[in-house]
Amino acid sequence: MHWSFPEMIRLFSDEYRSSMLSEGNFGVERESQRVNYSGDLALTPHPSVFGDKFENPRITTDFSESQIEMITPPLKSAEEVYKALNDINNEVKNALKGELLWPLSMPPRLPKEEDIPVAQFPDTEDGRQKQIYRNGLALRYGKKMQMISGIHYNFSFSDKMIDFIYRQLRIEKTKRQFIDEMYFSLTRNFLRYHWILIYLFGASPICDSTYNSVIFKELEKIEKCCPHCAGKIKNFNRYATSLRVSRFGYSDTDEKKYTVYFNSLREYETKIKKMMETESNKYSKLGIYKDGVQIQLNGNLLQSESEFYAPIRFKRNIKKGETQLTALVNRGVEYIEIRILDVNPFDKVGISVEQMNFLQVFNVFCLFEESKSIDEEQMERINTNHQLAALLGRNEDLMLYKYNDDSRIPLKNFGDEIFEKLRIVAKLMDKDNVEKKYSESVESEYKKLHNIELLPSERICREMDNDNRSYIQFGMEYAEA
């Protein structure tokens, strides 16, 4: 949008207006594998006590039959979301018999590839589509990669705040056009600066040896296409913050030809549709049917829009007969889904209230900051900074790329620039807040920028080293807590 950070700060400068910045709808989806008391992936069916996967809006499965997904409804505050997620988490824990919820994003001890159970669905048209889609994911990427779990954080600003900006800035567009452009503007800045969330909240610096085959395969690919990169990336076992969001976790390298730049809804729709309609030599060679059974939906770059992996996605509640993409095109962006958060093992529900408060400050900052279009060159730097923060974030000498020129900047210095504005936003949001919870969340996270010891990724490695514990032993201690 065509506004500046100082202009937006002035616009929300009084207490009544600033209170709107913390209002909206918020929700969390948490994925977690079920494990037995030895730390092995549970191979049992999804517990029947949770009912039909299609019918239960709070507890379902993700890729695997062993992978539970807990979903809160949209609520009005971080505190309400936390309570709702805690209630669901307790319900699941109490229902599990001889099993626990794995507290980490990277998988527990995995069986052989063929023994990992894909989620099972009823023999209905919708059920068959979901089943074939998941079988296709297993065929394309391997089941082990699909066993990674995370936190999806959903949010939207309040109608009151959106109306206020629309009126005050006298936007010469329809309300719907303005809302779409507002969320796309925020998203472009989120992409530019989300590396700092990977650094601060990354909690998957290590994995079990049963996942190593995925890492070795990716390292081989890197050595072939980028030999000079391989040496640096091999240091991931010393410096990683989040294997989950790195090349060793979810990756969209096969989709690069149709990179989505998030510059408009039309471009977003066109690029994703193109990937859904363009045949992939790699995937089509795998076949669509095997022994008379359909093994993937199609041989295209994307089987469906759900396969589009991105740090952030646009969402709309769908009506009968709609897909997520057609709902967006028909009625516009309703809310945003942040997808780069690792499960926090140091909080019983996988994400803390403080994290959610910080995310709200960060999202407002991304909204306020000027947001020009992203081009191919800038997207390349965005993706590079993402990978550097994920694989080498704990290297105190790490340099990131700036976006306005070809220069590089120390991670800490780049972070200081961001936190300078986050403090201003948090102070504004705390004007009518006695607790000063937004400023406190910013100061708490700022300490991590200059003290690696405070990072969750570093804490995981330190606790494992100090107590000479394996990855599985560490995970089981927090699973049983």
From Swiss-Prot:
Belongs to the glutamate--cysteine ligase type 1 family. Type 1 subfamily. Keywords: ATP-binding, Glutathione biosynthesis, Ligase, Nucleotide-binding. NCBIfam families: glu_cys_ligase (TIGR01434). Pfam families: Glu_cys_ligase (PF04262). Its EC number is 6.3.2.2. InterPro entries: Gln_synth/guanido_kin_cat_dom, Glu_cys_ligase, Glut_cys_ligase. GO terms for biological process: glutathione biosynthetic process. It comes from Clostridium acetobutylicum (strain ATCC 824 / DSM 792 / JCM 1419 / IAM 19013 / LMG 5710 / NBRC 13948 / NRRL B-527 / VKM B-1787 / 2291 / W). It is an enzyme of class 6 (ligase). It comes from the Bacteria. The lineage of its organism: Bacteria, Bacillati, Bacillota, Clostridia, Eubacteriales. Transmembrane segments: none annotated. This is Glutamate--cysteine ligase. GO terms for molecular function: ATP binding; glutamate-cysteine ligase activity; metal ion binding. Pathway: Sulfur metabolism; glutathione biosynthesis; glutathione from L-cysteine and L-glutamate: step 1/2. GO terms for cellular component: cytosol. It catalyses: L-cysteine + L-glutamate + ATP = gamma-L-glutamyl-L-cysteine + ADP + phosphate + H(+). The keyword ATP-binding applies.
